[in-house]
Amino acid sequence: MRHYEIVFIVHPDQSEQVPAMIDRYKATLAAVGGKIHRMEDWGRRQMAYMIDKLAKAHYVCMNIECDQKTLEELEHAFKFNDAVLRHLIIKTKKAETEPSIMMKEVQHEEARKSAQSDAPVAAA
């Protein structure tokens, strides 16, 4: 089996459906003995350029190990899911299990926001 990194971008109006999509893709992999080494939900982020007049979208990254047939099934599912705006599949040499740079940035932003909300409000 080969290792792949998959990033897919979901329409922002369908963000609440992302966990169900992820579960469906996990089930597809599990049915044939594939493995998920890393699953990251990057959340709603600004896109580099507009797609279908949208400036923001929901990003998900998966590092998986599967055979070619399963990869084709996943790609087919991405193509025919109207909520998926774009997808990218990259073959990697080994399994990536540590958090990606994007996920570290997301965690940093969340920590910064929680620190700001916990800070006492200065009296004016």
Curated annotation (Swiss-Prot):
GO terms for biological process: translation. GO terms for molecular function: small ribosomal subunit rRNA binding; structural constituent of ribosome. The keyword Cell wall biogenesis/degradation does not apply. Keywords: Ribonucleoprotein, Ribosomal protein, RNA-binding, rRNA-binding. Binds together with bS18 to 16S ribosomal RNA. Belongs to the bacterial ribosomal protein bS6 family. PANTHER family: MITOCHONDRIAL 28S RIBOSOMAL PROTEIN S6, SMALL RIBOSOMAL SUBUNIT PROTEIN BS6M. This is Small ribosomal subunit protein bS6. It comes from Polynucleobacter necessarius subsp. necessarius (strain STIR1).
